[in-house]
Amino acid sequence: MATALITGASSGLGEVFAHQLAGKGYDLVLTARREGRLVNVASKARQMGAKQVEVIAADLSHRDGPAAIMRELATRGLQIDYLVNNAGFGTSGRFDRLPLERELEEIDLNVAALVALTRLLVPAMVERRSGTIINVASTAGFQAVPYMSTYAATKAFVLSFTEGLAGELVGTGVKILALCPGPVKTEFQSVANNEKSTMPSFVYLDAETVVAQGIAAAANGRMVHIAGIVNFLTAELQRLMPRVLVNQISRRIYRPNADA
């Protein structure tokens, strides 16, 4: 059976990807920093149908993280047919008040690690003329987001990178998708310190819905998928609006209480 590598698999969308792909019969390689959490996710994935589940504890915010994962894959004799670049986090607040080291870690994890793993794994997929890559972007990638400036910029990169690579991979048998969720009910908001944003509750989707839509969109050869009809309509509307107006609206939604 085909094997899927899922980054950021210890919680949130990554955990749900593990469970849903296990239910489809995929063998799994799960990676994240928290090995204990990965072991628990792996146990449930086996119950849901995955015959083989490997756990690799690694920190992809370090530049040597992707290479370490590749070495471990080689040691265990594992071939990756399906890559889910899900690992990432966001920060929120005024940029000039945020710790620089944390902002750089965000860029390394959300961008550099994704590019590295894609570059390291896609040649073998092209050679086999078969493979699937899902890069988890965000609706934040369609416009700048004040108070989440770095995060939105990283997701804009993921979106553009995926679309560009999709053009290069035409005819190779390799499918690549940018999955663009809006707000999702996961621990992301607490990690980003953004639990008190004024985002209306009706735009939030559950992780199971987002992942199911992403898997289906990738299977159908889609290049970009925006999860949720409200998020889709919002993203399309923003294309027609003046950028300064979009910026002002985003500023009001994401502005921390201290800066209100």
Explain the meaning of each model-derived region.
Residues A166-V230, V244:
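SDR active-site lid
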